[in-house]
Structure formats: C-alpha cells, structure tokens
Design a protein with these regions (language model features):
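Helix-loop boundary and gating motifs at the non-cytosolic
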Residues: 6-55, 219, 223, 228-247
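C-terminal ends and interior cores of transmembrane alpha-helices
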Residues: 83-106, 293-305
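C-terminal transmembrane helical hairpin of 12-TM major facilitator-type secondary transporters
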Residues: 283-328
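Intracellular juxtamembrane helix-capping segments at the cytosolic ends
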Residues: 33, 126-139, 323-336
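Hydrophobic core of transmembrane alpha-helices in multi-pass small-molecule transporters
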Residues: 20, 101-126, 225, 309-323
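Helix-to-loop junctions at the C-terminal end of transmembrane segments
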Residues: 61-74, 270-283, 367
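Cytoplasmic helix-loop-helix junction between adjacent transmembrane helices
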Residues: 116-157
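Central cavity-lining transmembrane alpha-helices of secondary-active solute carriers
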Residues: 49-67, 259-274
Length: 416
C-alpha cells in the first residue's frame, strides 16, 4: 500500500462501542420477543405493532436529534441517546418479567410493551446521527470513509454478539440479556463523558435548515432506502426460504439460516474494517462496488437451490453491504457542509428503517407468489441504484473527489 494509514482518534471506537450496545439490543429484541410475547398471550398483530411503533418513532425523531447535535453539541445528544436506550431496555425487560409473573396481562401488558419500545425509538434514534456527526467532526476528508467504517462496525458487531450472548444469558433468565447490554450502555456513557466534545459549529450568519430534498442529500438517501428495502425483504423472508426451498426436509432450518446470517455478518465486517478501513477505499468506490456486489448476490440468492450457493451469496451480500454502509455515510457527510453533519446523519437514520416498514407489505405477498420474488425485487432496486449512481451529478462529484476542493468541508479542529 503506497500511503500510510492516518491515525484516527480513539473516540471513534468508544462511539462504536455505544452502537454495539444499540445493535445488540435491537437484535435481541427481534429474536427473543416474538416467542416470548406469544407465550404471554399476545397475537401476531400485537407483536408486529410493538416493532412498528418503535420504527416509526425512530424515523420521526432521528433527523430531529441530528439537527440538535449540530446546535447543542454531539456529546450531550450521544449521552441522551445511550441513556434513553438503556432505560428503555430495562423497562422493556421489567414489563416482560411482570407479564411472566402474571402481574400484567392483556391490553395493559401490550400497551406497556409498546410504550417501552416507543421510548427506545425516541431516544435510541439519537445515538447514530450524533455519533456520525462527531466522527465527521474529528476526521479529515481523506479518512472519512475509514472513520465511518469503524463506527458502523460497532453496530454490525452488536448484531453478531447480541444473539450469541443472548443464547447464553437466556439460560439464566429471559430478562438477563436486556440488563447486560443496558449495563454496557451505561459503561459507554462513562467513557463518553470523559471525551472532549468537538466544538459546536458557530457562524455570524444564520444557518439555513438542511432539507432532505436538498440536491446534496437526497441522492444518497435514495440509494440507502433502496438498500434498506432489499435488506428487510431478505431478512424477513429468509427463514421461510430455507424451510421451503433450500432445506425442505430438515427440521434445523432456523439454525441453518442463522449460520447464513453469521456468514453475512462476517462479510459486513470485512467490507467495513478491511476494504473500507484498512485498504482506504474512497467513498465513491465503496458505494459503486457495494451496489454492484449486492445486485449479483441477491440475483444469485434468488436462484439458489443448495446451502453452498446460499451461503456464498449471503457472504458476498454482507460484503457489499459492509462497503455500501460507510460509503453512503461518508459520501453524505462529505456532500454537505460541516454545519450540517448531524442533520445529514439524522436523515440517513430516518430512511434506514423504511425497509422494515415497507417490506412486510410487499415482500410477504411476493413470497407467496414465488419464493424468489422478494430477492429479485431487491436485485432490481440495486440495478436501478447502479444506473442512478452512474448518472447522478452528486454521486459523480463524490467519485471525482471534488470535496477536496470545497473549503467549507474543512474538518473541525481535533483536540483529542
């Protein structure tokens, strides 16, 4: 490698640890709550409502928290986000415990579970945009994709560790995994407290509010939303795909699907920490390569008929997603001015859950028509994303690295 790696501040790893706790907490909820809630007497519609209300709150509040971090400072919003996330996990766990003891039942139990998850959506949505703004503040334009790759690797690692740790702690109690990662969030808060927050952006001029329809913003949100829908369709139907198509004669289809998603997560980490971070791949190249890989991986997945084929496709799908995530984050960060870093991250946090809201309405009916259709839908979205990024002027601006000449994008002074 011809150029030396620029040393990035350790603060990024601390912020990544916070996202690890958030990612682990989210994955634990997705895995454990459906069977637990069913045991508590809740039906499928109620269980779906618990998830949907949280996602809706996340979508609404994420851009608000991002803008607030621009004006009141990153550290305050990061701490508020982690604190609210930890408290919501504890309240959720406590409500489940009361339900298992039959001290809460029926509608009251359901409403309290919804309230706890809404609290998670309200405050948990603060962590990613404020952390992303912080990372942008303390990284140069040349190292921006590396910095975001490290930050996003925390959430990815949480998605891996969450189910693994939950599998062990569930032997202790149903609520132990929630308390474990809530405690982890409290510990991260302590470390964040001792980090020197970047200087707030100040200007004698009135700063115009950033719009998600700004030409510097929406081209990256479009690609992110397409990836989110593709990813949600894959995640929400793959267990059925393994059961119906790949291993129809096996009773271990859930375990086999879990192995596939572990391989996908391994691909994500390779995309983030090897290709984006270690190899210093530029943001524009990360987006381009990520979309292309996802297109071929989803197409291959749709026509797979064996475990080997599916596992290969899932690994390369994860690899593409691991490049696309930090590629979009760093591209959007470089596309807007330094006074809009939190707001831009907030918009990105708003569109990421879109897939989990839209996909159930589309992917399940498509799967009923043909098991391959949800993945062909995702491949189609990635195909159109390829055309878009090669024709859109702002994506070309990023690929040509014109942000190097934009004096408005100078990094904040790093006092680490």
């Amino acid at each position: 490698m011809s150029k030396n790696l620029e040393k990035l501040p350790n603060t990024i790893w601390i912020l990544a640890a916070g996202l690890l706790c958030v990612g682990a907490g989210q994955s634990i909820v997705f895995i454990t709550i459906p069977p637990i809630a069913r045991d508590l007497g809740l039906n499928e519609i109620q269980i779906g409502s618990i998830f949907a209300t949280s996602a809706l709150a996340w979508m609404i509040l994420s851009p608000i928290w991002g803008s607030l971090s621009d004006s009141v400072g990153r550290k305050k919003i990061v701490i508020v986000g982690l604190l609210g996330f930890a408290v919501s996990l504890i309240l959720f766990s406590f409500t489940i415990s009361l339900g298992q003891r039959e001290l809460l039942t029926g509608s009251l139990l359901f409403l309290l579970l919804v309230a706890a998850r809404v609290l998670n959506g309200i405050f948990g949505s603060a962590t990613r945009p404020s952390s992303g703004g912080w990372v942008a503040d303390i990284s140069s334009t040349e190292s921006r994709s590396r910095a975001f790759a490290r930050l996003d690797s925390g959430f990815s690692m949480g998605r891996i560790l969450g189910p693994a740790v939950a599998g062990l702690l569930l032997l202790v109690s149903y609520t132990a995994p929630f308390f474990f990662f809530a405690t982890g969030a409290f510990i991260v808060i302590i470390f964040v407290t001792f980090q020197k927050s970047p200087a707030k952006f100040s200007s004698k001029e009135t700063i115009k509010k950033l719009s998600m329809f700004d030409s510097r913003v929406w081209p990256f949100l479009i690609v992110s939303a397409g990836f989110g829908i593709s990813n949600a369709a894959l995640v929400q139907t793959s267990s059925f795909f393994f059961q119906d198509v790949i291993t129809p004669s096996s009773d271990n289809y859930i375990a086999l699907a879990s192995i596939g998603f572990m391989l996908s997560a391994l691909g994500v980490l390779n995309g983030q920490l090897l290709i984006a971070d270690r190899l210093q791949t530029s943001p524009g190249s990360l987006v381009k390569l990520g979309v292309i890989l996802n297109f071929f991986a989803l197409t291959g997945y749709a026509f797979s008929t064996s475990l080997v084929e599916v596992y290969i496709c899932l690994f390369f799908y994860g690899l593409g997603g691991g490049m696309l995530g930090p590629g979009i984050s760093s591209s959007l960060s470089l596309s807007v001015g330094k006074e809009y870093q939190g707001a831009a991250g907030g918009f990105l946090g708003m569109v990421i859950p879109v897939g989990h809201v839209i996909s159930p309405l589309v992917s399940m009916p498509l799967y009923m028509l043909s098991p391959s259709l949800p993945y062909l839908l995702g491949a189609s979205l990635m195909f159109f994303a390829m055309i878009f990024i090669f024709t859109n002027k702002r994506h070309k601006w990023i690929r040509d690295k014109n942000y190097r000449e934009d004096r408005n994008l100078e990094v904040f002074e790093n006092s680490q």
